[in-house]
Amino acid sequence: VDRLVGSEMCIRDSLKKAIMLSFRIYPMDNLSGPYSSWYDKAHLLKGKTANWTKEQHEAAGFRMTPNSPVRPGSFIGKNAVLMPCYVNIGAYIGAGTMMDTFSRAGSCCQIGENCHISAGSGIGGVLEPAQALPTIIEDNVFVGAMSEVVEGVIVGEGSVLSMGCYIGQSTKIVNRSNGEITKGRVPPYSVVVPG
């Protein structure tokens, strides 16, 4: 997201296109490590923090446990905690957010500050398959274990998604107090349960 104009997102399509073009022009390559070897696009094989010193980690200000791949081109805010998780190219993880064990931040998704993305949960990306809008998790959101939020859905500030929620653009979100049905956006300070 380049910026918000009122409540509308302005997307910088040129950046998304540049990332997608990089997949076509860079060759595949091999990288061997202590546990395995990997075969991927050469420019993505080494993670964002490959060869960082202790001082560089301290300056970045986030905690990163072993086996937490963070691809180049992503952003991790201060005081974020990355348990063994996966952060794809272009993803934005806000300050103070926890990416819990085996959670995933998809390409170019936006996760706000002080969020908790619980174990096994996924926040969808925009590159594969190509999507028009990124998935956005606003500040102070809790996403329960084994949940998926995809297809450019926006989860409003302060919301809680219970365990096992699957939310895409076609998912009906029902306001229990008035029966109103929305799609594509979870209103701020909502509590969402599947069913």
Model-derived features with residue positions:
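Single conserved hydrophobic/aromatic residue that forms the stacking wall/gate
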Residues: 1-6, 10
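Serine/threonine-rich low-complexity intrinsically disordered regions
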Residues: 9-11, 40, 53, 188-192
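Generic secondary-structure signature for well-ordered alpha-helical cores
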Residues: 9, 24, 28, 164-168
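Structural signal for interior beta-strand "rungs" in well-ordered beta-sheet cores
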Residues: 58, 62-194
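A contiguous, low-structure linker/loop signature
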Residues: 15-61
